[in-house]
């Protein structure tokens, strides 16, 4: 008998949702950074064994939006509640429950689907603090289970996976066993470039960046994959920061992104990057759609 199911990973920004998904999948399919709102699109991670398939849906961190892009991200996250049988509500062990958590809990109660509370980053707190956190969240909602983990170190992650597989129902294998995500390579390439921008830049730059892969094709003579990508920003000052002195920052971003892209593709890559200014793109629906943030996603 084959069992399968869809599982959403929900929570505030920076609680470790993408770190968890990457650990489960054994490779990077969701980009990570210490900047809030790193994940902007829903991303499937397809975990398949001989007898089970769990389709995880990593979601943007739920926050109070200030732009049309923020609206898209929050609606994209909540839309998964219509698509899954189980929700992993992830919270950090080293932060107390806040208004953002309470807002999510109210939506989860209304959805009327099983919710597992996943308390991440247990490596950062004393066990007594963890117990207080568990009691506090349990006082707000009747969770199906509570599972403390460390997504970064992998602590207790196998326990959570076993809990999910034990509760799967008989179902189809929705995706081939060798498919690990629903997004095309172009999307993953654009995300890997954006991840390096987030890593190397500060202040207002990360939130204002989008990456568009203009072309991606193999050069038969060199046997390299040629990729042309444009980094979009909202202001000239941001463009200057990303390019850097004599182009040094852009070269660093390209070099580090190329390493990850080559690892993913299993091919040598020639990466060309440009930086363009598109003023206030985060509040323009046409620009959002052009840059891959389309309302059709939810």
Curated annotation (Swiss-Prot):
Residues 3-170 form the Era-type G domain. GTP binds at residues 11-18, 58-62, 120-123. InterPro entries: G_ERA_dom, GTP-bd, GTPase_Era-like, KH_dom-like_a/b, KH_dom_type_2, KH_sf_prok-type, P-loop_NTPase, Small_GTP-bd. GO terms for biological process: ribosomal small subunit assembly. Residues 11-18 are annotated as: G1. Residues 201-279 form the KH type-2 domain. Residues 120-123 are annotated as: G4. Pfam families: KH_2 (PF07650), MMR_HSR1 (PF01926). One of its GO terms (molecular function) is small ribosomal subunit rRNA binding. Keywords: Cell membrane, Cytoplasm, GTP-binding, Membrane, Nucleotide-binding, Ribosome biogenesis, RNA-binding, rRNA-binding. Residues 37-41 are annotated as: G2. Its main location: cytoplasm. It is a peripheral membrane protein. Monomer. Belongs to the TRAFAC class TrmE-Era-EngA-EngB-Septin-like GTPase superfamily. Era GTPase family. This is GTPase Era. The gene is era.
């Amino acid at each position: 008998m084959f069992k399968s199911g869809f599982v959403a990973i929900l929570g505030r920004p920076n609680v470790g949702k993408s770190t968890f998904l990457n650990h489960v999948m054994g490779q990077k399919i969701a980009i990570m950074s210490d900047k809030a709102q790193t994940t902007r699109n829903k991303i499937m991670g397809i975990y398949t064994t001989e007898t089970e398939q769990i389709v995880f849906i990593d979601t943007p961190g739920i926050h109070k939006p200030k732009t049309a892009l923020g609206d898209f991200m929050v609606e994209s996250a909540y839309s998964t509640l219509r698509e899954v049988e189980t929700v992993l509500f992830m919270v950090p062990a080293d932060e107390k429950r806040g208004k953002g958590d309470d807002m999510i809990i109210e939506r989860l109660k209304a959805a009327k689907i099983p919710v597992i509370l996943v308390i991440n980053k247990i490596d950062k707190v004393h066990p007594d603090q963890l117990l207080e956190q568990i009691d506090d969240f349990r006082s707000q909602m009747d969770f199906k289970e509570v599972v403390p983990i460390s997504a970064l170190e992998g602590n207790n992650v196998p326990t959570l996976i076993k809990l999910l597989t034990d509760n799967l129902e008989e179902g189809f294998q929705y995706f081939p066993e060798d498919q690990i995500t629903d997004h095309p390579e172009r999307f993953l390439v654009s995300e890997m470039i954006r991840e390096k921008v987030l890593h190397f830049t500060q202040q207002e730059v990360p939130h204002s960046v989008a990456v568009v892969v203009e072309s991606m094709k193999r050069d038969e003579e060199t046997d390299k994959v040629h990729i042309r990508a444009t980094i979009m920003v909202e202001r000239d000052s941001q463009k200057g920061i990303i390019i850097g002195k004599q182009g040094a920052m852009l070269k660093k971003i390209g070099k580090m992104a190329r390493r990850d892209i080559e690892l993913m593709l299993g091919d040598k890559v020639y990466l060309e990057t440009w930086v363009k200014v598109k003023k206030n793109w985060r509040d323009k629906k046409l620009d959002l759609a052009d840059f891959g943030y389309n309302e059709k996603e939810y």
